[in-house]
Amino acid sequence: MGSAISVIIEMISYLSEISSVTGISVEAILSGEAFAAIDAQVTSLITMEGFLGAETALSSIGLSEDMFIFMQAAPELTSTVMTEFVRESVQTAFIFQTVAGSAAFSLGSLHGYLAHEVPIVNRNMALIPRRPADYYDILFPGVQSFTHALDVIHGWGHSLFQSVGEYIWDTLRRETQGAVESAVRDLSLQTTHQFLDAIARMMENSRWVVTNLPREAYSRIYGGLQNYYAELPGINPAQRRQIERALEYSNRPSIEDANSRQVLEAELGRPDVQRRSQQQEDSSSWFESGANIMRYFAPGGAHQRVTPDWMLPLILGLYGDISPTWQTYIDEVEYGPKKKKRRFQ
């Protein structure tokens, strides 16, 4: 009997201490509602806030591990102690009532009570009226957010650190992503401009030749005439002698031609004349396939870039600036010719 009373006194003192620390009523602790609420809060802190363990989460709300264990065992411990207390009380009363002559009545009345040592009452039954989290906010709109703003002690430091950390992380991620995208875009533009600039400079410094297409056409025509005359039948001897006399008369040199021929034959023995004549023969046997376009440089040695007029639209187009004519052609290709507005008479 004395041990049960001492245990009850210690439980009452410990319950008072926990109630003063947490602000939870003693009835809620004994019924188990306090442990369920604290357990849910600790789980939320570990899951959502990122605490490393239960001890850290308990210390953040002002509880120790012993208090948490006591709150867990309080309902069962209370039931056990009270049962033991009742049993010892009944035994004591039984002794006194036996002495007084009422043992039979006490034994008969207490036997039915002691047959239900485990209580059949629902332990999850609410002992206090349940109020939702937004109860006062429903009655007085805005009061919950106002009181939360005034409560600068409970969770203020951790919330501030978390908010500042999230802001710094979001800013760093956003700036890093923007810097990477800008660097990739600038690199692609720079590479494209360098490639187009290299093509433009190569075209400016290249040697351009206009192919002589008429000469090739004439050679094909005269080749066909030559084949035509080659297939004609031969001439008779009288016609041949007549043609030879005509050619001999046309090729007869005059006095000036004879004098120049004598001078040339006299100089043929010199080495420089022989070399010059050999070069003339070589040059006459070789001919170009087209006409070379002369390249003009900047006047005065300014070493500036020079582009012919016929190449200027192409060079400007490589640098992104096109002529109005070219722009009109592109618009017609992409969007089609402009439709003329029909005039109504």
From Swiss-Prot:
It comes from the Viruses. The keyword Thylakoid does not apply. GO terms for cellular component: host cell; host cell endoplasmic reticulum membrane; host cell nucleus; membrane; viral capsid. It holds the Pfam family Polyoma_coat2. Residues 329-345 are annotated as: DNA-binding. Keywords: Capsid protein, DNA-binding, Host endoplasmic reticulum, Host membrane, Host nucleus, Late protein, Lipoprotein, Membrane, Myristate, Viral penetration into host nucleus, Virion, Virus entry into host cell. A motif (Nuclear localization signal) lies at residues 336-344. A lipid is attached at G2 (N-myristoyl glycine). InterPro entries: Polyoma_coat_VP2. One of its GO terms (biological process) is viral penetration into host nucleus. One of its GO terms (molecular function) is structural molecule activity. Residues 289-324 are annotated as: D1. Belongs to the polyomaviruses capsid protein VP2 family. This is Minor capsid protein VP2. It comes from Hamster polyomavirus. The lineage of its organism: Viruses, Monodnaviria, Shotokuvirae, Cossaviricota, Papovaviricetes.
